[in-house]
Amino acid sequence: MAEVVKTSAIAPATTMSIPPIVVMAAKAGWRWQWQRLMGGLGPADAAGNYCRPKSDHLEAEVPNPLDLQSRQPDQRPHLIVGRSCPWAHRTWLVHQLRGLDQSLNLITAHADHKAGRWQLDPPWLGCSSLLALYQRCGAPPSHRATVPVLIDPSQPKILGNESAQLVEVLNRWPSHNDAPDLAPPDLQNSIHRWQELLQPNVNDGVYRCGFARNQAAYNRAVTALFAALDQVESSLKQSGPWLCGEQITLADVRLFPTLIRWEMVYAPLFGCSERPLWQFPKLWDWRRRLYGQPGVQTSCDAKAWRHDYFGALFPLNPGGIVPTGPDLTTRVASGISNE
């Protein structure tokens, strides 16, 4: 008769009639498969640290402002974003904060989990997928079709597909006279310093936590992540209300997509749960303040985030169950966490 294997103390009080050797073999097999599957999400170094793959980006361009002003609405450049992508969210935020809707059209691509690509519904320029659109624009066959991407439909041509460059381009994009400058010359050094801290430790840091291949790699990532958040909290306390002082800048734009997804995705799925955000009161107020800026709430879709992260990242959520979550606006506006 098979030996009865008792479940752990954290599971319901049940037993299962599975021989221990089968359980051990299943764990070993799953561990091996998990490592292979995680490799599909992103590479890791020999120590198990997640390393973001190099992007296939094209140098960004800004069309002639006079040319843009003379175009019909359907011939304006189009910014294509995905609701769940935090890198695309940066460009969307600049579009909203600077009121670029009169000179730049916005398209939202949808994640197709089965095909593993971005889909365009309805199709645009005769293309129903972002890959087909990249190919139509003459992108090298080896390039991944990623969001965000800025496309000029008159040729058609890709004007840029790297978020770090595109936020700079969109900050110089023709707009109405009172559109804010998110990177004024006197704050360039401060913006750059924040970028140097936040990109590896927070923006990539949450992925380094979630995609770590072992406990030591996770421990390193989560320590760096919360140390960086402590620095943000301290800076906001001393010289807020924004990261660079009295005005919102690209430094705020780059941080916001990560922190607005915190309770919905990164804490529960990526293990970024050492401390809840409400324990950073200045950072909590900062997030609430930015969320309340005109047009920002429109760019935030918690349901899409949960659906795409929990539904697509099979190695992190093999059951495929997409959890419900708190109302985003209620959570952001609250000073009390339910965690």
Q: Can you annotate each of these PLM segments?
A:
Residues 1-339:
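C-terminal alpha-helical interaction module
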